[in-house]
Amino acid sequence: MKKLAISIGDINSIGLEILVRSHEELSKICTPFYFIHESLLNKALKLLNLKLFNAKIVAFKDDKDYEFNFIKKENSLEIYSFCLPLGFKVDENFEIQAGEIDAKSGLYGFLSFKAASYFVYEKHAHALLTLPIHKKAWEDAGLKYKGHTDALRDFFKKNAIMMLGCKELFVGLFSEHIPLAKVSKKITFKNLSIFLKDFYKETHFKKMGLLGFNPHAGDYGVIGGEEEKIMEKAIAFVNAFLHSKKDEKFFKKALKDENLQKELLLNFKGKGVYLPYPLVADTAFTKAGLKNCNRLVAMYHDLALAPLKALYFDKSINVSLNLPIIRVSVDHGTAFDKAYKNAKINTKSYFEAAKFAINLNSKA
């Protein structure tokens, strides 16, 4: 069975309970490695009044060299160590504060995630599955990242793309955790063309639509529309480029050369993978809209995620594209209000994320 590296997220959240309650069923479809120290795991299990059997846990440690070793088998747990350059000393000796924002839990969750990311990068596992973190806890810990995807960009120096959804509807986010005031400035021909090219090459979806930025997609310039003009130009260029089968070197050159862009467009007569005009966002998520196109790109976070979560909250997952590793995540937050309360916990997104990762081919 394929191996999954699973980072525990914020230990003060529902993540650890999802992990424990799902372990037996998850182990039927993959071999999970949980990135948590035994002492901290035992504290969480005691608070939850749960037990974890036949599991593999990985204690991670900051070191200048990468090294993965089996340590011991104890109380039906297989305990491993993974040393790597983390940039921080790992402190697992802190108290769990259920449902609270805490810098120590924030830093520990980040280091669990970083260690699990490089565990996959070093080919010890097929994919990474991340449990939810709290962005404020990361900030309080002195971390500069706004979330997992932001950190992955820095780890691997790649333009990671966030995609969320399920088989009924997937949405790629052109921008993620940035203020709305900054989104319009980010929408440039160059930025959007690169994004659309990369998004297609990662997904190979056959038909995709861009959600308009302005109400009614600008309504022919009556309600703004400047962003939609840029979107139309980028769509036409990327459709023509993908059809041409030209290489990356040509793409970079054509981004700056309007004559090459015109040449591509003159030679392009077919139907592109992207619909030619931005879609009106307020009807794109209706039954008829999704029947027409259920693979979408949104210029900003809430434009896509509000309707996605209203329609498919329980089964949606988060996928990071355009990286040297496979990374998936649950599509929900820390749910501090339910943490360590034996509340009803929905594990469907967790299983959907695991199954999605298992079914993907390994990154070269």
UniProtKB/Swiss-Prot annotation:
Sequence positions that bind a divalent metal cation: 177, 216, 301
Biological processes, Gene Ontology terms: pyridoxal phosphate biosynthetic process; pyridoxine biosynthetic process
Molecular-function annotations in GO: 4-hydroxythreonine-4-phosphate dehydrogenase activity; cobalt ion binding; magnesium ion binding; NAD binding; zinc ion binding
Binding site for substrate: 148-149, 309, 318, 327
SUPFAM superfamilies membership: Isocitrate/Isopropylmalate dehydrogenase-like (SSF53659)
Coiled-coil boundaries: none
Chemical reaction(s) catalysed: 4-(phosphooxy)-L-threonine + NAD(+) = 3-amino-2-oxopropyl phosphate + CO2 + NADH
Task of the protein: Catalyzes the NAD(P)-dependent oxidation of 4-(phosphooxy)-L-threonine (HTP) into 2-amino-3-oxo-4-(phosphooxy)butyric acid which spontaneously decarboxylates to form 3-amino-2-oxopropyl phosphate (AHAP).
Other facts noted in the record for this chain: The active site is located at the dimer interface.
Name of the protein in its database record: 4-hydroxythreonine-4-phosphate dehydrogenase
Protein species of origin: Campylobacter jejuni subsp. jejuni serotype O:23/36 (strain 81-176)
Taxonomic lineage of the native organism: Bacteria, Pseudomonadati, Campylobacterota, Epsilonproteobacteria, Campylobacterales
